[in-house]
């Protein structure tokens, strides 16, 4: 079944910035996808095409990307008569049409919008749910499907929030839950305790939320943040069942050859500028004190030496995001250098569904885990909820239990778990790192 019409438009993400929405039509109907965008982006990501016209949207317009879909990709795709069930052929067709290494001609945001909408059309053409279609595209085992352990970003720092806290994300993972339904309940209960505790200890403004729905209190050190979270877990009665994870997003505070933990402070203290080795020791102190199970982007995207030195001593899951940007070449280098053991999978970093699947399978082949991720500039699109189930990754982060663009993903996974039923699902829980093997 081929595409009969393609239409793109500008819509808005959760930050109020323009982004690309694409509608693909077949004889089965209309299929839509919206492209997300990040704030802390890796410099090696595929190019998100923005207009750069400062007189409109502060230069963040996507009218060029929208035009590229409507005037170039759409007509060529219709003319090609490619079958929407053949995701690989369509994605490769668009990549060839672009002709650049990082999709800078047409824009990764233009290509990805079409790619994801086509996947929905392909699922409909086969008469199967999107997660099943993705599993078949990836040659993954299907039933019982693996339902992921959610990682909730409950406290925001770094470039996602105010205050002086350098590290970007503090997450909770209900690894001791029996199901996704229970994991959401545990997460919700801890989140509400955390908000109440923060307001009590810091003031009413401490309950304000950041870009991803976590609270964004004015804190200075990760120890303050982790104490709050650990106390909230204990007060909720879920100690042991709910663990902690962190994403420092270290590329954001890597300056010269040092990591500046005071980078948000207008009056920084020189003693807070650390070498890679010193930062590694700092993390080890944190890991010894708190029930942490995962650490993402502990070092900057090109500080290979710090990654390689730290990984063997870490003792927890180490996730590569800015280091690998879902790019097969970067992933292979990271594997060869033994820098991490988990890939953060963001579809808009690479720019097509097929390439995202290939990146996940490359990571799996090296014995790595894969964590599917949203972006900080999100929308109501729920594609990644089906993606995480289809790819059996066993883990996903999609913000907190606040803000509808985050809850959209959590609620979709709830629906999938319910639709499949207990006999056809395995909740990853504490085995989140090896979801694909369950």
UniProtKB/Swiss-Prot annotation:
Main location: cytoplasm
Signal peptide: none
InterPro entries in the record: Enolase (IPR000941), Enolase-like_C_sf (IPR036849), Enolase-like_N (IPR029017), Enolase_C (IPR020810), Enolase_CS (IPR020809), Enolase_N (IPR020811)
Active site, UniProt feature: 212 (proton donor), 346 (proton acceptor)
GO molecular function, one term: phosphopyruvate hydratase activity
Enzyme class: lyase
Subcellular location: Cytoplasm
SMART domains: Enolase_C, Enolase_N
PANTHER family xrefs: ENOLASE
Entry's family note: Belongs to the enolase family.
Protein name, UniProt field: Enolase 1
